Design a protein with these regions (language model features):
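Short conserved catalytic/interaction loops centered on acidic-Pro-aromatic/His motifs
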Residues: 127-131, 150, 156
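Long, contiguous binding/interaction regions
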Residues: 2, 35, 40, 52, ...
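A structural signal for well-ordered alpha-helices, especially hydrophobic packing surfaces
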Residues: 18, 25-28, 32, 51, ...
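Helix-loop segments that flank and shape redox-cofactor active sites
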Residues: 2-9, 24-49, 114-129
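Disorder-to-helix initiation segments
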Residues: 1-17, 97, 104
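Conserved alpha-helical segments that form or flank metal/cofactor-binding pockets of metalloenzymes
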Residues: 42-79
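Amphipathic, non-transmembrane alpha-helical scaffold segments
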Residues: 14, 44-51, 55, 101, ...
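Acidic/histidine-rich alpha-helical segments that form the ligand environment
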Residues: 59, 83-136
Length: 159
């Protein structure tokens, strides 16, 4: 009898998302600490909101991974080894507020693409609960991109 609940490629992609979400949270925290400028009071708490959003997504993805017989990455070493996002040291005087926000937009676009990949893989493997979860998370990331790009004077799909 075939195992209808074996989703190896979905598990692999969920683990990719675990690594990427963990790194993105670190990058957002870096922005939170080092941002300066006239929009500081508005953007500084927004970074907390983004990290709260990503922490919720990360927890749900890791728990879904366990539910489908996977083992989420759980060490800093694993996150750094597997993430597709940069691990860059910056200081407050290296980047402008717009630079930080552009970097954040680019990283959210990367995450959006990883969610899309996960949605497609889950569809192929017929893991529809995972697909539903990722659709909701991608929708939230799409909104983040739209709003950040509007701040930058761009459209949501401007590259």
């Amino acid at each position: 009898m075939a195992n209808n609940y074996d989703f190896p490629k979905t598990r692999e992609q969920l683990n990719q998302l675990v690594a990427d979400l963990s790194q993105l949270q670190t990058n957002i925290q870096q922005t939170h600490w080092y941002m300066r400028g006239e929009n500081f009071f508005r953007l500084h708490p927004l970074m907390d909101d983004y990290n709260d959003q990503l922490a919720d997504q990360l927890d749900n993805i890791a728990e879904r991974l366990i539910a489908i017989n996977g083992s989420p990455y759980s060490t800093t070493h694993e996150f750094i080894e597997h993430t597709g996002l940069p691990d860059e040291k910056v200081t407050w005087d290296q980047l402008t507020m717009s630079d930080f926000m552009q970097r954040l937009s680019d990283q959210f676009k990367y995450l959006r693409d990883q969610y899309q990949k996960g949605i497609e893989i889950a569809d192929i493997e017929k893991d529809f609960p995972t697909q539903d979860m990722l659709n909701g998370f991608k929708e939230a990331i799409d909104k983040n991109i739209w709003m950040i790009n509007a701040y930058l004077g761009e459209g949501p799909y401007d590259e």
